[in-house]
Amino acid sequence: MTTNYIFVTGGVVSSLGKGIAAASLAAILEARGLKVTIMKLDPYINVDPGTMSPTQHGEVFVTDDGAETDLDLGHYERFIRTRMSRRNNFTTGRIYSEVLRKERRGDYLGATIQVIPHITNAIKERIIEGGEGHDVVLVEIGGTVGDIESLPFLEAIRQMAVDVGREHTMYMHLTLVPYMAAAGEVKTKPTQHSVKELLSIGIQPDVLICRSDRAVPANERAKIALFCNVPEKAVISLKDVDSIYKIPGMLKSQGLDDYICKRFSLNAPEANLQEWEQVIYQEANPGGEVNIGMVGKYVELPDAYKSVIEALKHGGLKNRVTVNIKLIDSQDVETRGVELLKDLDAILIPGGFGYRGVEGKLMTAQYARENNIPYLGICLGMQVALMEFARNVAHMEGANSTEFVPDCKYPVVALITEWRDEEGNVEQRSEQSDLGGTMRLGSQQCQLTDGSLVRQLYGSDTIVERHRHRYEVNNMLLKQIEAAGLRVAGRSGDDQLVEIVEIPNHPWFVACQFHPEFTSTPRDGHPLFSGFVKAASEYQKRLAK
C-alpha cells in the first residue's frame, strides 16, 4: 500500500481551525472508502500536554493506549472512525528527548547532533510510522507559519516530498481572509504574505483554505490563485458556520476531495455524507431544550472541557433536544451558595486535580442528591459524590480523599499506591505491583452490575472506557457506604477497583471513575450522555406538571 500525505499548516493568525478542517477533509475521504488517519505535530517543548495547565492549553485527550495528547485528537475521533493512538501526536519536546537519549547511548557514533538531519529525520520517521497501513495521512502542524518553534517541523515536511515523492505529498495551507467593513470587501494581502512566508521555507502550497466570516467571492479567489501560484479550483472558501459538522459538506461541495483523489491517483467512489446530513438535521430541528450545569474549576476556558461539552451536545442530538450548557465555577458555589444551581435540569461535575474548588463540588453533589436532580459525575466528579455520600448519608464525618487530606479519618478515596488493609494499616504498592504507582491511563475493561442503571443504558455486561486518574475508591471503607444505600454499578475487569456508583433511590444519579466523553461521537453518541440528557428532559417534564 502506498501512503499519501497531506500536510496542513496555518498562517496569519492562530486558532483558524486547522484541526477541524483536517478532520472534516478526513471525514470526506473516509466516506469515499479510503483508510484515513490524522496526526498532530505540536511545536512546544513539553514532552506531552499531560502536565500543562488546562486553562492554558485546554483539555488533555486520552487515547485507547493511554497517551495524553492534544485536544485536536478528540476532534479527529469525533469526525472519523479511526481510533487515535500515541503515534498520532508528538511534540518538539518528545522528539528532542528521544534524539538526546540516542546520543547518550552512542547511537550516532560520535556525530555532531544537529536540527538537520537528526531532528528532522526523527520527525519524518514518526510521520511515516504513524501513517503505515493508511491510504491518506493528514498531518497538522501546530502553530503558525513564521513561528520559530515550527521551523524543524516545516523543514521535515518539506523534505518528505523529496523522500516519498512529490506525487504522494500535498501541502494544504489555512489562512485568514479578513473582511474590512470600512472598505466593504475581503482582503487577500495577508494570505499572499503568508504564502510568501511558506515559500521562503521551500514549501509551495497545493491547496489554500481561506477562512473568513463570509464566503470569499469568486473574483477574490481567482486573485489569490494568481498571486499564490495555486489552481483556482484549489482555493477553497471556508466561512464561519453555526455547526462544525457542516464543514465536510462545505468542502465536498467545492470539489476538494475530487481534487485530492485526482492528485494522488486514487480511484475511490463518491463520498456518501448521509450520516453527517442526519447529524446536521438533528441539530437544526430539536424538539425542545434542557439546561445542564457543569460545575468545574477550569471554566474560564471552555476548551478545558471540550470533549465533555461535545458529548453533552451529542446526547442532545440523540434525544432531539438542544443542550444549553451553563459553566459554573465551583469556587463561586463555595462563596455564593447553591443558588447558582437553580433552574438547572441536570448537573455534571467533570474531572480535575487539586483541592481548589472541591468544597463547591461537594455542595453541588449534595444539592443534586437531595433535590433528585439528574447527576453525572466524571473522575473527580465521582470521587466528590462518594465523599459527600459518605459524610452526609453514611455518617462518616470528615470523609475525604488522601489527595486533599492525607491523614483523614475516613479516606474513602486514596492514591492507587495507598490502600488500607482490614486492620486499617496503610498498604504501599510500588510501580512493580499489579496496579502500578502513578496515573491509570487508557482503555480499561469494566464489568457492569446486573440490574444497575448503567447496565440498562449500555445494554452490555462488559464495557471498555478510558481512564486518567491517580486516585481510586478505597475498598476497605466500601461496605459501610454500600450499607447506607450507594450501589457499586461497575468494577474493573479484575474486580479490584470500583469504576461506577449509583444511588438506586434517586431518579438518575450516576458517577464513573473513567472519562466517557472521550468516546462520544456525533454520529453514535454515548450511552451515559444520551441517558443523562434524557433524564434532564424527564426532570424538566416532571417539574412542569
Curated annotation (Swiss-Prot):
Record: active site: C379 (nucleophile), H515, E517
Chain spans, region Amidoligase domain: 1-266
Pathway noted in the entry: Pyrimidine metabolism; CTP biosynthesis via de novo pathway; CTP from UDP: step 2/2
Catalytic activity from the UniProt record: UTP + L-glutamine + ATP + H2O = CTP + L-glutamate + ADP + phosphate + 2 H(+); L-glutamine + H2O = L-glutamate + NH4(+); UTP + NH4(+) + ATP = CTP + ADP + phosphate + 2 H(+)
UniProt binding sites for UTP: S14, K187, T188, K189, P190, T191, Q192, K223
One of the record's GO cellular component terms: cytosol
Positions that bind ATP: S15, L16, G17, K18, G19, I20, D72, K239, D240, V241
Gene3D superfamilies with a match to the protein in the record: 3.40.50.880, P-loop containing nucleotide triphosphate hydrolases (3.40.50.300)
Domain Glutamine amidotransferase type-1, residue spans: 291-542
EC identifiers of the protein: 6.3.4.2
Pfam families assigned to the protein according to its UniProt record, in alphabetical order: CTP_synth_N (PF06418), GATase (PF00117)
Assembly and oligomerization: Homotetramer.
Miscellaneous notes: CTPSs have evolved a hybrid strategy for distinguishing between UTP and CTP. The overlapping regions of the product feedback inhibitory and substrate sites recognize a common feature in both compounds, the triphosphate moiety. To differentiate isosteric substrate and product pyrimidine rings, an additional pocket far from the expected kinase/ligase catalytic site, specifically recognizes the cytosine and ribose portions of the product inhibitor.
Functional description taken from the UniProt entry: Catalyzes the ATP-dependent amination of UTP to CTP with either L-glutamine or ammonia as the source of nitrogen. Regulates intracellular CTP levels through interactions with the four ribonucleotide triphosphates.
Family: Belongs to the CTP synthase family.
Name assigned to this protein: CTP synthase
Organism: Erwinia tasmaniensis (strain DSM 17950 / CFBP 7177 / CIP 109463 / NCPPB 4357 / Et1/99)
Gene coding for it: pyrG
